A protein has these predicted regions:
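Glycosyltransferase catalytic domains, chiefly GT-A lineage
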Residues: 1-175
Length: 175
């Protein structure tokens, strides 16, 4: 399982046999350019579908070790074959998120998402994904303090058994 530090899960999750990712993403050239954008040597991308929507991996659960090995070997081979370029971030995002979806589609491995891509910005209470809000909170201490207070209140309300951790953090920060 993989969890980004900007993704908060506020409920217990059920795990089964399918891959679980945060959500699907639209294919846009500025984030997910066409395959001919990538300059690679000695690596041929298998006959993957270019139309399958990428999987955001802010949360990722992969229960099948055979699939995990297939996907990671494809992603690593792709990154190792990357020719010097100006934008390795696009290569990394392709290898991590788009290739994951392509591999799942290719192997017919079932995929489930925690959030629906078409309702990402609608209110819901199960997950918090900070995305661009991270920079806003870095730049604005009042915004950051407000977010921290809301998280503490949520933890105290929904997970009172962990309230002691908040108290320990307060105590440690006062030393």
């Amino acid at each position: 399982m993989m969890l980004d530090t900007d993704f908060i899960v506020w409920r217990t999750l059920e795990f089964a046999d399918e891959i679980i990712a945060a959500h699907r993403e639209e294919i846009s050239d500025d984030i997910y350019p066409p395959l001919d954008f990538f300059a690679v040597k000695n690596h041929v991308i298998p006959d993957f579908s270019e139309t399958v929507l990428p999987l955001n991996t802010a949360f990722l659960y992969v229960p099948d070790n055979d699939f995990k090995n297939f996907y990671t070997s494809q992603a690593i081979a792709f990154m190792k074959s990357a020719v010097d370029c100006d934008d390795y971030l696009k290569y990394m995002v392709f290898a991590e998120q788009r290739m994951l979806a392509m591999c799942a589609n290719f192997t017919q491995t079932p995929v489930k998402t925690l959030l629906d891509k078409d309702s990402l910005h609608f209110p819901q209470s199960d997950f918090t994904h900070l995305w661009g809000a991270k920079q806003a909170m870095r730049d604005n201490s009042a915004l950051r303090a407000d977010f921290v207070e809301k998280c503490k209140a949520r933890i105290n309300r929904d997970f009172p058994e962990y309230s002691y951790i908040i108290e320990r953090i307060k105590a440690a920060s006062n030393k």
